[in-house]
Amino acid sequence: GSSQFSAIGAVDSPVIRDSYTDKPMIPGSSFKGKMRTLLAKQYFRTAMLQEHNADPEIVLRLFGSSNKNAIRPSRLLFSDMFLLNEQELKAVGIDSVTEVKFENSINRLTAIANPRQIERTIRGSKFGLDIIYNVEEEKEIEEDFKAIKEGMLLLEYDYIGGHGSRGYGKIKINGLKVETAIGDIDSKVIDSCNKILKEV
């Protein structure tokens, strides 16, 4: 969620919404950024993460680099994710696709309370995920997809957005399918990539 202002009685941290439908959405940048960070942690040989232009080669290959001496475009393009199953949720008696959770932190020294309201999407919400993979080296496709699979599995164990240590932002990724959008790729390679992503 975001917290640009906090009026009396208002939600302190509202969810991000699609300005066209006013429904919750997940920015592609949030998904991409978290997946990149988790993969960098996984592949780094040091205890501390470095700045993103120093990421391991496989991560730079997939997510790009802005290093002025070695600019690399991202092979992965992430679209924003929009709510898919609002009608399905309403059919089981759910009136709103978001809920507001009231939380309260208390200062240990002063005992002063700090109540706040955090909006979140309800459990069972489904969002559409579209990722474009740009082929640069055909021999690297399967290796790249193994890293993509690993990043998605890491995301399922982690979270997207804020307050993850309190259970927010848990996701499950399923129904992944690889298709050729432009150009010709060997069908055996496509089948192999689909097999890899079935492990998510």
What does each model-found stretch correspond to?
Residues G1-I106, T110, N114-V200:
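RNA-binding basic/glycine-rich loop and surface signature characteristic of RAMP-family CRISPR effectors
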